[in-house]
Amino acid sequence: MSDRRLEAVGLGELKVADRPDQVLVCYGLGSCVGLALYDPVVRIGAMVHVVLPDSSMGRGREAPPGKYADTGVEAAVAALVDAGASRSRLIAKAAGGARMLRLAGSNPQLDIGARNTEAVRAALARHQIRLVAEDMGGTYGRTLQLFIETGRVLVSTVGRGEHEL
């Protein structure tokens, strides 16, 4: 693993990678959703760290394209196609969307994790991209990794170990 280059994808960020040694990582996903998109033929991938479900929540303020599910998926698909990926070959895997606050159970509008999860699924459906695997929901945080060389996606959780999506 020492020859791999870990690249953190921070809150609201979107990163595209095309080198075999690159590993894109979203650390500490709580209510946020980490979305990995990958073209297995040309081995190009992207990761988006979605913070909120919809860009209308920004009220006209400038925000990074990955902050919202709708703009994040749109920007990631465009960036991947620009880098040489084929929209029709893109596959998606996602993790996160947890309910991190107990208050969320009383008002669905406050359950940002569930809203992020649904918004990511809807944005992918609009772009006709298959969500082939996910680890979303629950009440615990996760870390998501995308290995560009293989397209392998790992989810790590404190106390629950690591598994492949």
From Swiss-Prot:
Pfam families: CheD. It is an enzyme of class 3 (hydrolase). GO terms for biological process: chemotaxis. Its EC number is 3.5.1.44. It catalyses: L-glutaminyl-[protein] + H2O = L-glutamyl-[protein] + NH4(+). Keywords: Chemotaxis, Hydrolase. One of its GO terms (molecular function) is protein-glutamine glutaminase activity. Gene3D superfamilies: 3.30.1330.200. Probably deamidates glutamine residues to glutamate on methyl-accepting chemotaxis receptors (MCPs), playing an important role in chemotaxis. PANTHER family: CHEMORECEPTOR GLUTAMINE DEAMIDASE CHED-RELATED. Belongs to the CheD family. This is Probable chemoreceptor glutamine deamidase CheD. It comes from Symbiobacterium thermophilum (strain DSM 24528 / JCM 14929 / IAM 14863 / T). The gene is cheD.
